[in-house]
């Protein structure tokens, strides 16, 4: 995508972006520092891509980062500066015909407005590759130029001999200039399923080499998208291109009359197997000015309608560390909400504390998010780091485990509440209306500090808790009665006994707690590790105390646990 296209699109969008997005609560000094850091990040990406042929981020993440830069500049009254991403791409060789940009259309309504009053409109896939000029002399391909800044590019003619998949000799000895896209050849590539996988960067990297080589060269194809000096009619241009050995230009181009047809073909190519990756569709009009008047900006006769983002750039607002029932610490990134495939995403899990430590993500960082299986938010990478690194209260993983936090003591509230949620959930006692919010209120009110305290709560105590009405108190008492009368098998599961499902139903707590590790290992499906876990569970002091209390409350299966607890 050209600098001029990006600049036009970004300047068009910056007002609406700023209105839709909240500005960071930064001092003037911090704003200046953070904006400078983002500019430096973008400049580094530009240099790697255009000069070294290395794409450090996906194109859509790059665009979103530039949007974010303009938003920050407006937030803090800074002058709009968008240094050309092609600053290091300009080459020494002038193009015979300038490469234009394309106007970017963001939705079906914008497509309809663009098509209003236009005749002879065609649609074709927007091939995701590297733009080039091809110069034929007497029918032979003699020059291959990188797009550069649209006016001047680098000479890639040294690679012509290795590009076996490209027509290097026309049927007639003609002098012709073509413009097109060098792409990575793929087999039955479905964009909606596979995405682009950085194929553009792969091709750019190969072409940046001093020598390409036959094997890499054979993996590169060409999609010709313009013949600047060709006939006025697009259909005639495509027919002649096919006769010269460029059939894909005709095969993947369709004349349309309505925005609905544009929508149809965009969706069709998005979900159909193609020989190349794409990132949208191109709309072009038959009528255009003479080639000598073309400029490297977005003209009126070409527009792009890109596909939905496969990755979204999201700002981290908060890093939370969730502690589950078993003591596992899971970092959770709270995000400034973004939309992917019509899904609003405001948080994503990092999976493990070790992963967070390796990534060191802090509030203010920009991260890439995608959807796993088209539904589950997935963290992909850190895209940009904030200059200011906030200090976070990070839990020590060693403090938590299977036998920690059986009570609501300091530093234990979260794991303890998770134990209560599990106990009362469908996998345990199946007590209606006792979710995390209810238990949190009771714990914070000091009414529930152990796993058995709820068994003795009365209506008056429940009504003293903020947020619990008389109706809710009555419902909770009914739910507590249900839990109290559940059979032992459900209590066993709710307390988290690490026993397999095939433990005999008629066994009680005293029988289970009386087994040694070697006794457990004689049962089907229990190995040495599980046997040790079971023995440790039943001999844990806190677990024994809970069992004793349940026995005194008359809970099924816990009679006689006083003796077990004193062993």
From Swiss-Prot:
It is an enzyme of class 6 (ligase). Pfam families: DNA_ligase_aden, DNA_ligase_OB, HHH_5. Keywords: DNA damage, DNA repair, DNA replication, Ligase, NAD. The keyword Endoplasmic reticulum does not apply. The keyword Transcription regulation does not apply. SMART domains: LIGANc (SM00532). It catalyses: NAD(+) + (deoxyribonucleotide)n-3'-hydroxyl + 5'-phospho-(deoxyribonucleotide)m = (deoxyribonucleotide)n+m + AMP + beta-nicotinamide D-nucleotide. It comes from the Bacteria. Its EC number is 6.5.1.2. GO terms for biological process: DNA repair; DNA replication. The active site is at residue 126. InterPro entries: DNA_ligase_B (IPR020923), DNA_ligase_CS (IPR033136), DNAligase_adenylation (IPR013839), DNAligase_N (IPR013840), NA-bd_OB-fold (IPR012340), NAD_dep_DNA_ligaseB (IPR050326), NAD_DNA_ligase_OB (IPR004150), RuvA_2-like (IPR010994). Catalyzes the formation of phosphodiester linkages between 5'-phosphoryl and 3'-hydroxyl groups in double-stranded DNA using NAD as a coenzyme and as the energy source for the reaction. PANTHER family: DNA LIGASE (PTHR47810), DNA LIGASE B (PTHR47810:SF1). Belongs to the NAD-dependent DNA ligase family. LigB subfamily. NCBIfam families: PRK08097.1. This is DNA ligase B.
